[in-house]
């Protein structure tokens, strides 16, 4: 993509309403625009990041055996009355009446609808286990939306729902999602810690929140620092095998949100030099809620003995749009964003330091064409902005690699390759720069 043809509305001044780093940088970098309180338009740069995060989530859900579908944003109020949650959910739910006086709601979550789909088609235990997920926009009418995408009213979420014949099978499904989440966040360059948590309006008696430690987080957390060094399962993890050792390794080290924190256990089990009492950002949460919804909504299957039994369920959420902000909170410096490579809007930026010079123009064009042909997402800054401005823009938007092309370097057959993560620089030939980015 040529920057001269890309829509990138950089802001020179930070909007006053932006209270935290991620909100400030997303607005300044032209990633989004606020349209109403807690509601944002995603501009091209932000959308590229959002789509890459969404794809990682999708790949790891598929790897763990979940099956993608897509449910509508609007749901019938009667479904929620059937489960008993319509009146219990509170003012965060956006309630709508259509022209025929039918009561609808803009879905804040989908347990009722997925249960209705399940009971319409699944009759036997032989069709279990089943895990269905979708990635869809949701709305919760937060009383005080703030912090940009971290606490907005409209947000993109992945929610998965598992169905099993009994509790033992349901806990296996829970474990699959637990491991899938570890892998998902690690691929995004995040250290997300699974912590025991309250179940809230979803219900059930087992839940873990996946928390990224950050002082700007909304959750108070307590953990043993050893949890930061635990290994994340690799590509060879067998989701059909026994995942219990992985789960035990991650849950035997103390980690809990403030809502379920056990002060006595924390004091007793965690050495003083390993105690962490800080704040964190919730990027995902998983629940096992047993037969809470299947009992009320009659989601039954015939068991091995032919007797109908309610299925055991779980739900598993990832805040896809919130992750954009969480990654920025974890990956930035005073100059801007430092995207991990897997979620960056572009992998490399070519900076033409003397636009209009025949030599630099030709070298940049050659690099741009070769990298593009080899499948590298590259942004070519072919604007007439001064070199200092180009450096500032590239740092602000956080492209992992910058190829600086100027007349002095080209005179020696070199370009400068800069790594945004650590600021390291190296003089290499154009061919070496291409090789570095394609191997």
Curated annotation (Swiss-Prot):
PROSITE patterns: AA_TRNA_LIGASE_II. One of its GO terms (biological process) is prolyl-tRNA aminoacylation. One of its GO terms (molecular function) is proline-tRNA ligase activity. It is an enzyme of class 6 (ligase). Keywords: Aminoacyl-tRNA synthetase, ATP-binding, Cytoplasm, Ligase, Nucleotide-binding, Protein biosynthesis. InterPro entries: aa-tRNA-synt_IIb, aa-tRNA-synth_II, aa-tRNA-synth_II/BPL/LPL, Anticodon-bd, Anticodon-bd_dom_sf, Pro-tRNA-ligase_IIa, Pro-tRNA-synth_IIa_bac-type, Pro-tRNA_synthetase. GO terms for cellular component: cytosol. It catalyses: tRNA(Pro) + L-proline + ATP = L-prolyl-tRNA(Pro) + AMP + diphosphate. It is found in: Cytoplasm. Coiled coil: none annotated. Its EC number is 6.1.1.15. PANTHER family: MITOCHONDRIAL RIBOSOME PROTEIN L39/PROLYL-TRNA LIGASE FAMILY MEMBER, PROLINE--TRNA LIGASE. Belongs to the class-II aminoacyl-tRNA synthetase family. ProS type 2 subfamily. Homodimer. Catalyzes the attachment of proline to tRNA(Pro) in a two-step reaction: proline is first activated by ATP to form Pro-AMP and then transferred to the acceptor end of tRNA(Pro). NCBIfam families: PRK12325.1, proS_fam_II. This is Proline--tRNA ligase. It comes from Rhodopseudomonas palustris (strain BisB18). The gene is proS.
């Amino acid at each position: 993509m040529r920057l001269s043809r890309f829509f990138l509305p950089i802001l020179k001044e930070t909007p006053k309403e932006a209270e935290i780093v991620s909100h400030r940088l997303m607005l300044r970098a032209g990633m989004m625009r606020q349209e109403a309180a807690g509601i944002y338009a995603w501009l091209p740069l932000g959308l590229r990041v959002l789509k890459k995060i969404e794809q990682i989530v999708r790949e790891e859900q598929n790897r763990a055996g979940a099956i993608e579908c897509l449910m509508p944003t609007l749901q019938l109020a009667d479904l929620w009355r059937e489960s008993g949650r319509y009146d219990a959910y509170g003012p965060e739910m956006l309630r709508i009446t259509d022209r025929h006086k039918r009561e609808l709601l803009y879905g804040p979550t989908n347990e009722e609808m997925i249960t209705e789909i399940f009971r319409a088609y699944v009759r036997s235990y032989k069709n279990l286990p089943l895990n269905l997920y979708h990635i869809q926009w949701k709305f919760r009418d937060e009383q005080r939306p703030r912090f940009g995408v971290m606490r907005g009213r409209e947000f993109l979420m992945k929610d998965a729902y598992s169905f099993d014949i009994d509790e033992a099978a349901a806990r296996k499904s829970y474990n699959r999602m637990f491991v899938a989440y570890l892998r998902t966040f690690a691929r995004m360059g995040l250290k997300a810690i699974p912590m025991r948590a309250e179940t809230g309006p979803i219900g059930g008696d087992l839940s873990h929140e996946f928390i990224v430690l950050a002082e700007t987080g909304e959750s108070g957390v307590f953990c043993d620092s050893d949890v930061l060094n635990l290994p994340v399962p690799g590509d060879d993890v067998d989701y059909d095998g026994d995942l219990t050792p992985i789960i035990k390794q991650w849950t035997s080290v103390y980690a809990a949100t403030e809502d379920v924190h056990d002060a006595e256990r924390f004091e007793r089990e965690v050495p003083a030099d390993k105690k962490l009492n800080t704040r964190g950002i919730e990027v995902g949460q998983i629940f096992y809620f047993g037969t809470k919804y299947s009992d009320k909504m009659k989601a039954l299957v015939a068991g091995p003995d032919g007797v109908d039994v309610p299925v055991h369920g779980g739900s598993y959420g990832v805040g896809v749009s919130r992750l954009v902000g969480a990654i920025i909170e974890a990956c930035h410096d005073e100059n801007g964003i430092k995207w991990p490579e897997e979620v960056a809007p572009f992998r490399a930026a070519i900076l033409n330091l003397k636009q209009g010079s025949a030599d630099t123009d030709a070298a940049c064009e050659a690099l741009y064409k070769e990298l593009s042909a080899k499948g590298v997402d590259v942004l070519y800054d072919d604007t007439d902005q001064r070199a200092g401005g180009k450096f500032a823009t590239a740092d602000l938007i956080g492209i992992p690699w910058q190829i600086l092309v100027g007349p002095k370097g080209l005179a020696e057959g070199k370009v400068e390759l800069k790594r945004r993560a650590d600021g390291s620089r190296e003089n290499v030939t154009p061919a070496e720069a291409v090789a570095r980015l394609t191997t």
